[in-house]
C-alpha cells in the first residue's frame, strides 16, 4: 500500500502543480455518499443500494473506500458494465442485420465477454482467444465461443443475393472491426 500512496502522491503533485500554473484550485473532496455513488456507477453502472450506503457511512476504517472498490470489482455487474464498450466495438448483436433481420443467438459470446471481465482475464489472452481460439492446440469450448468475435458481422439471408459479393462484404466488415479494435484506426478507406 505504501507504493500505491507514493504513486498517488506523484500524480496528485503533478495535477496540483498544473492547477497552480493555471491559477486554479482543486475541487473539494466529495462526501462519502457521493464518492460511493460515483464509484458504484463507474464500476457497475448501478447506484448503490441504501444498505450499501449505510454500511459505507458507518465504516470509519482508513481503507473503507478500498473495501468498496474490492466489493464492486467482485460484483457480476462489474463484468456487465465493462463488457458494454467491448461488445459495441465487436459489433455484438442478437440478429443478422440487413432487411431480413432474423434472430441470431450470440448470447454465449456476450456471456463469455462478461465472464472474462469478471475473471480479470489477462488482456493478451482475451484478445488471443477471440482472434484465434479455435486455432490453439486443444481449444476448449470457451476458446471456441470467444472466436465468435470473428462472426459478429452482419449476414445477409435475403434470397437472390450474390454470394461472392457478400463474402467480400463480410471480410471487409471484419477487417474494419479489427482496425477499430486493435489498431485504433479506421481502415475503411482501404476498401
Question: What are these model-derived regions, one by one?
Answer:
Residues 1-191:
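Short, structured secondary-structure elements
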Amino acid at each position: 500500500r505504501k507504493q500505491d500512496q507514493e504513486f498517488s502522491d506523484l500524480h496528485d503533485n503533478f495535477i496540483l502543480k498544473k492547477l497552480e500554473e493555471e491559477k486554479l484550485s482543486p475541487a473539494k473532496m466529495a462526501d462519502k455518499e457521493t464518492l460511493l455513488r460515483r464509484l458504484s456507477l463507474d464500476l457497475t453502472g448501478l447506484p448503490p443500494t441504501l444498505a450499501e450506503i449505510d454500511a459505507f457511512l458507518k465504516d470509519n476504517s482508513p481503507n473503507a473506500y478500498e473495501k468498496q472498490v474490492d466489493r464492486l470489482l467482485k460484483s457480476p455487474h462489474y463484468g456487465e458494465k465493462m463488457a458494454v464498450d467491448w461488445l459495441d466495438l465487436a459489433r455484438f448483436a442478437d440478429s443478422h442485420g440487413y432487411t431480413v433481420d432474423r434472430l441470431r443467438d450470440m448470447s454465449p459470446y456476450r456471456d463469455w465477454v462478461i465472464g472474462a471481465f469478471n475473471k480479470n482475464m489477462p488482456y493478451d489472452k482475451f484478445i488471443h482467444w477471440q482472434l484465434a481460439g479455435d486455432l490453439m492446440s486443444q481449444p476448449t469450448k470457451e476458446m471456441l465461443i470467444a472466436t465468435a468475435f470473428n462472426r459478429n458481422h452482419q449476414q445477409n439471408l435475403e434470397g437472390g443475393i450474390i454470394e461472392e459479393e457478400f463474402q467480400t462484404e463480410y471480410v471487409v466488415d471484419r477487417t474494419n472491426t479489427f482496425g477499430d479494435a486493435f489498431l485504433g484506426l479506421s481502415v475503411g478507406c482501404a476498401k
